[in-house]
Amino acid sequence: MVKLTTWLKKIGWGETITQRIFCFYIYCILFGSLLLFLPIALQDNYQKVVSYGIDWQGKRFEQKTDYNFLDALFLSTSAFSDTGLSTVVVSKTYSIFGQIVLAVLLQLGGIGFVVIAFLAWRLFNFHKKEQYSFYEKLMLQSERGGSKLGNTSEMILVSIIFLFIVELIYGFLYGILFYFIPGFEPANLFADHAKVSTQLKALVVDSNQTIAAFNDINKAFQAGFFHSLSAVNNAGIDLIGGSSFVPYRNGLGIIIQWLTISQIIFGGIGYPCLFDGFEAIKKKIKYGRHTKHQFSLFTKLTVITNIVVILLFFTLLLMVEFIASDSLTNTIVNFSDEKKSLINTQLQSQSNQAIHASVFGNNPNASRVMQLFFMVISSRSAGFSVFPVASEIQTTKIIIALAMFIGASPSSTAGGIRTTTLAVIFLALVAKFKGQKEVKAFKRSIDQTTVIDAFLVLIISLIAVLLTAVLLPLSMEQPVSFIDALFETTSAFGTVGLSSGATVNIALDPNRNTFNFLALCLLMVMGQVGVSSSVLTFVRKHPKANSYSYPKEAVKIG
């Protein structure tokens, strides 16, 4: 009986800090699932909209199917992990109550459940001088803290206040922009014809119908504040429609893109970096501009790695887009007469250049460059899309998948293996090639345990993502390529939310394969918690210590 009680305590609460945080997350997801499964959370009684838009003939379509608890669990996991993958069109499936539940889950997952509890405790005990315990400090550090325990609480308070202010200001800005900028519903460029590839079928042009938020003050600010909350938490869920930010891919929509980019960076850079920046500004104000702030190794590695990764992937996407013969730009410019006969009848008589402008706007090349830059930033963890991902060629999908796999920074709202992991692995390889015994960066030596952990994170992440990508298509009725399956699993692990269409296929799968739902949910939680913390969940509080050691012997490898 005692053993059973002990086991139940371990399952329900956990022994270690990591186990308890993991349990908090699971309970929040399950509770959110129950709320999203209530009839009050849905617009239509247990029906979900899986696709919505305008077809190539200009007719509005809406595809519905049954809504079940797996959908609620998937959306709750996606929202709490700040991923954005969805089996439904959120704005057409959930009621105001359901959208509020999603917003709360986004905020809880982005800021952190333990951090929210800490803020609530500070709010209701502001008049007391009571100090929180060493254990509570460890809980905060484990979820959103940096490497130093002493300044964890101050760092979290500063970062949260800053992010809340950003959410409010940007919410008002988005509301104004959504109200005044006429975002048009995207219409399919091609007919659903057997001769047209999946890539070309996904191409869109603007229809003559605006989105619901345009000239509607209530819907504009509702969508604005929801988007602000989603963007700063790097979630990728929106209330615009079924095509993410495609209505704002050109023209004045670029203003919204730049605002979103800045929020994604604020949310994904990590609390330690935000606090470091705050400390630097505070010192400049207090002691003058001649004072030099000593930035932490974490901040230096994070900022430099982020810049390098963004520039690298942006350059790769530009090269593929403007050099590859089968890229979207070159494909449209070189449309054959056979292809043109299958497109929207209103565009058939136009030149290829005019059709190209219809897809990419009045400044096609500039718009396409901006779209690719937005996709690079968004693919780091956010998941907003200004172009249908399914229309991209396989090479582009692989590049975006690599960016999603890396993710953004630790102690942030982002997922993936994290930028610091990549930086440590790169520095370790450089040290090995130079014959150095220590891994060094900015006049600091990185602990050997950290180096080993970085390689473990990489290996475990690769195994989890690749294994799921191999198994995912096997149980689906509709054919899905390995690249698309890999894109989907990487998106889940990186808590990004970009989709090549596989998630919709899962939602439409008549077999209702539970494995696909749960596998992606598991990857989303792993990406949110972090691989290191996920592995530590299974570590005992007091591991059995060996009182002996064996002789060492070299083993030939490679």
Curated annotation (Swiss-Prot):
Signal peptide: none annotated. GO terms for biological process: potassium ion transmembrane transport. It is a multi-pass membrane protein. GO terms for molecular function: potassium ion transmembrane transporter activity. It is found in: Cell membrane. Keywords: Cell membrane, Ion transport, Membrane, Transmembrane, Transmembrane helix, Transport. Pfam families: TrkH. The chain crosses the membrane at residues 21-41, 69-89, 100-120, 160-180, 220-240, 251-271, 303-323, 386-406, 413-433, 454-474, 479-499, 519-539. One of its GO terms (cellular component) is plasma membrane. Its main location: membrane. InterPro entries: Cat_transpt (IPR003445). Belongs to the TrkH potassium transport family. This is Uncharacterized cation transporter MG322. The lineage of its organism: Bacteria, Bacillati, Mycoplasmatota, Mycoplasmoidales, Mycoplasmoidaceae.
